[in-house]
Amino acid sequence: MPRCRWLSLILLTIPLALVARKDPKKNETGVLRKLKPVNASNANVKQCLWFAMQEYNKESEDKYVFLVVKTLQAQLQVTNLLEYLIDVEIARSDCRKPLSTNEICAIQENSKLKRKLSCSFLVGALPWNGEFTVMEKKCEDA
């Protein structure tokens, strides 16, 4: 009986693998499910946004850490990864880099230091493996 289950499982995954395989001509991964809205409170969305902000703050040359003010929308696309497109509003905080683990940050209130940005992050994830990659990042002044 277990042998039949394994055979069934293998036969079911073959079509999925064929659909998700890379097209060598286009060098793109097949889309299994196009972008669809997903709740911003979804655990995977939160993990992806946390990761994207860690990367943003690491790469940013700003002396201050940026925080998410508001999540505008989140969408999910399924390829060989779970791809989350997350639109957020971020702002400069009152915490300087590098951030210590026990520091509590608030949005910058000083008018000379205030700065808000609208950002879109495309994060590829295999959350069950703890794998996250910022595939695209676009930020502009809000």
Curated annotation (Swiss-Prot):
| Superkingdom of source | Eukaryota
Instruction: Give the record's keywords alphabetically.
Output: Disulfide bond, Glycoprotein, Protease inhibitor, Secreted, Signal, Thiol protease inhibitor
Q: Which GO terms describe its cellular component?
A: cell surface; cytoplasm; extracellular region
Which Gene Ontology molecular function entries are recorded, alphabetically?
Answer: cysteine-type endopeptidase inhibitor activity
> What is the taxonomic lineage of the source species?
Eukaryota, Metazoa, Chordata, Craniata, Vertebrata
UniProt entry tagged with the keyword Disulfide bond = yes
Q: In which tissues is it expressed?
A: Proximal caput region of the epididymis. Lower expression in the testis. Within the testis it is localized to the elongating spermatids, whereas within the epididymis it is exclusively synthesized by the proximal caput epithelium.
Full protein name: Cystatin-8
**Which organism's genome codes for this protein?**
Homo sapiens
Leader sequence segment: 1-21
